[in-house]
Amino acid sequence: MKYDYLIVGAGFSGAVLAERLSSVGKKVLVVEKRNHIGGNCYDFFDKNGVLVHKYGPHYFRTNSDQVVEYLSQFTDWLPQEFKVRAFVKKELYPLPINRDTLNAFFRVNLKTEEEAEKFLEEKKEKIKNPQNAEEQVLSLAGREIYEAFFKNYTIKQWGIHPKNLDASVTARIPIRTNANDCYFNDKFQAMPKEGYTKIFEKMFEKCKVLLETDYREIKNKISYQNIIYTGPIDAFFNYKYGKLPYRSLKIKFENYKKEFYQDWAQINYPNDYKFTRIVEIKHVTKQKIPCTTISKEYPTWEGEPYYPVPNPNNEKIYQKYEREAQKIRNVYFIGRLAQYRYLNMDQVIKNALEFFEEMKK
């Protein structure tokens, strides 16, 4: 069979484009090197019947009506307010930092946003244009908050001192002066009712998917017109400009014969233990079963690529690959790995939908 599109990767970028192209009559072949669809969003029922996220928690949230409308074709939703705590000095504090965090941590009694703003103004360091992740936090919340909540967590998470990471790394986490303890501000926050894998199964219904397959081993054996590549861009070019670093995770799952292990879906451990956080995803999947599974995350440089490492040197390397990519006809690079960008799920989906619209022109 002759395919219009060979799509490399079965995560959200590949799935959206496979579904959209199939819907307009294009013949699509999806090739995935892993033994499952869904990329890092893949979830499954463990031996105890608990729905777990194999590659760490994926909390769905977005401000895009377009993304919600699109995904709602493939799933019903469980509305959520995702809430996270940080374990610091043997106490649990709301994350992101909010007025309650400030009151508890500094033993003060700030009652209004204005009082909290004034308090932070006295704590923060006067840095007009933060140049790195450390300066970003210091400019918003000051040294004490940085040292207690951000510094060691960032070092654990990235294996790099915050001074050597882009300000964007810590800018993702707001500092609030109100008492809002929701982890995200997005207007739509939910979990897919039957999990993420079910979404992908429906999205791939009209196209052929090959699992445990390296596209390089089959691309000369099949006929196709275009490639959509969602894998690591440096791998595509055989690392000719050097390897782009990705942070990965080793995740240890533990099952307990009780309804819940902890009171929150996620507790971060900035300063204690080698793991960064304990996640009990059952809090947000709303399963009603008498046991639970938690995951402990240990950041590492080995394993599946999770997070591009944002700093100026890596950006320079990526730009070299990006220029190479622009020279190739009928090969399209899209997604977190192909674009070497830290993208949330909704951003990946929106980018793929917009890319499809461009392709139709």
Where are the model-predicted features located?
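N-terminal Rossmann-like FAD-binding beta1-loop-alpha1 element of flavoenzymes
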Residues: Y3-V30, F356
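Short loop/edge segments at beta-strand edges and connector loops
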Residues: G9, E81, V209-D214, G335
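Short, well-ordered alpha-helix to beta-strand connector turns
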Residues: Y3, G25, C207, S223-Q225, ...
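Glycine-rich FAD pyrophosphate-binding loop
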Residues: S22-K47
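Structural/interface elements that position substrates and couple domains in central-metabolism enzymes
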Residues: E69-Y70, I145, Q262-W264
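C-terminal segments that line or cap access tunnels to active or ligand-binding sites in enzymes
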Residues: Y224-Q225, A235-M359
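Dinucleotide-binding Rossmann-like beta1-alpha1 core, especially the glycine-rich loop
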Residues: N48-K123
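Active-site/ligand-binding neighborhood in enzyme catalytic cores
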Residues: K89-N226, T230, A235-F237
